[in-house]
Amino acid sequence: MSNPIIIGIDHGYYAIKTRHFSFPAGITAYSHEPYTLQNTLEYGGKFFVCGTGRQPILRNKMENDNYYLLTLAAIAKEIKQRGEKAECSVNLAAGLPLAGFGREKKPFREYLLRSSQPVCFKFEGIPYKVTIEDVKLFPQGYSAIAIHPELIQNEPSVLLMDIGGWTVDLMRLDNGVPNASTCRSLELGMIRCIDETKEQIRRDVGLSVTDAQVERVLAGKACSMDEDARSIIQKQGRLYTERLLSAAMESGFDLKAIPVIMLGGGAAVVKGNVSEQDGLCRVFALIDDRVNAEGFER
């Protein structure tokens, strides 16, 4: 019998990430087959279109089945991408913030593992029969260092800043080891930045721009847009960066004294808005938001 396929999944508030994919964490249920099977999961007699916008923020991701359903979609995407058989065994590797790792580890493992194996479902019309043999959980952020150990080489202390959709998780590494007493979680993720930016544009210009438009301009990419709205987005990106750096300093991290490794979906935005006047010691940015998921697989 072949060994189980190891699939790393980063269950973000804003996006689901695997080694090869990143897609929005929204999900919409239908009682009948939708007009297209693209990104459509069929499970338990219902149809779910995965990657549609974003879902309401859940303090507890285990409150409903949405993240389990998104997990099945992520598994199917990875199986197809890797050229594996649709009937197979997998080991899931997922992550949790270090601040709540001990509290959430057991229930989140049970949430993903469940009792009825194998799991039978269809994704984009293809039937899958997947046995989830095990679920391993790892600290978010720290797992990315498994991919880029050179970032902490010769650095006695560094700050990991994982800028996600809803939270920004902070953790200091001393001699390459996480210092658990320094873990902080700030509710200052990119969703906050995007929502406040859209509201500012509505007030100042009277336009209703989309999340996707705001994200693209924040990332420094071209798109057709009213120039006043574009200017507001760029200004809000800088204001968000200032606020985040200030909150990190208030949490006890002297960013002028120790290097910062930024990762997560917001890393590129914040790195692009850091200026010399901020006086930061040194900033590294892992701008691929899939780096945590890849690290989980190590």
Residue ranges and their predicted role:
Residues 168-174, 182-183:
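Short, acidic (Asp/Glu-rich) active-site segment that either coordinates a divalent metal cofactor
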Residues 157-159, 166-171:
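Conserved active-site beta-strand-loop modules that form the wall/rim of enzyme catalytic pockets
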Residues 162-165, 189:
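Short, contiguous, pocket-lining structural segments
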